[in-house]
Amino acid sequence: MVCARHQPGGLCLLLLLLCQFMEDRSAQAGNCWLRQAKNGRCQVLYKTELSKEECCSTGRLSTSWTEEDVNDNTLFKWMIFNGGAPNCIPCKETCENVDCGPGKKCRMNKKNKPRCVCAPDCSNITWKGPVCGLDGKTYRNECALLKARCKEQPELEVQYQGKCKKTCRDVFCPGSSTCVVDQTNNAYCVTCNRICPEPSSSEQYLCGNDGVTYSSACHLRKATCLLGRSIGLAYEGKCIKAKSCEDIQCGGGKKCLWDSKVGRGRCSLCDELCPDSKSDEPVCASDNATYASECAMKEAACSSGVLLEVKHSGSCNSISEETEEEEEEEDQDYSFPISSILEW
């Protein structure tokens, strides 16, 4: 651009700067997106006014780019009404320089597109047998557990070797963790020596099934571990002197069941549907009635609003000496959901 002699110097400089700005803007024009959907359009806007080189420099497989430099209204219409931005250009066409993160590898799929798939490194695993995960499920080996963690459960860990057990017998917990059995007679390994931070808000308080208020889920887990048997969560918040379930508010779709034995309420899940299975073993409940299964017992409790617990397996009329010993132990046990120990 050549400025005419009669043009003021300030105006000429302003025009030069404007041209430079437009050149820079055109070089950067484009929008960066976090993924390309199955419909071929770009979705989840990351940043506007980026060049393709800048957008694709992250190495993320799903990052995509559109060349059009459009206004905010058009972007809004694309995202809300059109299923994403058209003319979507994926940053990666092959697996070259793709960073999938730990435990994943890039592979070309049947449509010849790069995809990150779970491929954990199992070369250093010495135990080849089944393992019990923190979710209470048995996995055929540790490698299968690592794949499950990669797919949908980032917090999943091996808690002990072997199949998940119903008692703490033959359970060898690693390190300083201790075995505790929950109300469904599933054995879990928990750690006793962890330091629990003081709660930052009153919303962290929990009322245990023992009628004691705990500062947080961590404090409840620690008390459970030190006690050596389950305490369990009655409801969220500080314990109150409730006269009935009407005084207790349950969240998360739970219903209050009244424990007449100790005069306290407990929030329990009541949305479980009992399957039609002939393999279920009957149970004798705390009301001295026999139910077709533990699930049927819970269903009856939710229907009546009165807490029922398993006294022993089998009919109430068939108590063996071994069952009586188990009953004495269970009478001292407070039931609790596994979330109160592991997932809080």
Curated annotation (Swiss-Prot):
GO BP of this protein: ameloblast differentiation; BMP signaling pathway; female gonad development; gamete generation; hair follicle morphogenesis; hematopoietic progenitor cell differentiation; keratinocyte proliferation; negative regulation of epithelial cell differentiation
Glycan attachment points: 124, 288
Short name of any one Pfam family annotated for the protein: FST_N
Official protein name in the record: Follistatin
UniProt cross-references to PROSITE patterns, sorted A to Z: KAZAL_2 (PS51465), TB (PS51364)
Domain Follistatin-like: 94-117, 167-190, 244-268
Residue stretches making up the Kazal-like domain: 112-166, 186-241, 264-318
Disruption phenotype: Follistatin-deficient mice are retarded in their growth, have decreased mass of the diaphragm and intercostal muscles. They also fail to breathe and die within hours of birth. Some of the defects are similar to those of the BMP5 mutant mice, which have defects in the thirteenth pair of ribs. Heterozygous loss of Fst is partially retained in a Mstn-null background, implying that follistatin normally acts to inhibit other TGF-beta family members in addition to myostatin to regulate muscle size.
Chain spans, region Disordered: 315-344
Signal peptide: 1-29
Note: Induces muscle hypertrophy when injected into the tibialis anterior muscle with reduced response in older mice.
Subunit record text: Interacts with GDF11. Interacts with activin A/INHBA. Interacts with myostatin/MSTN.
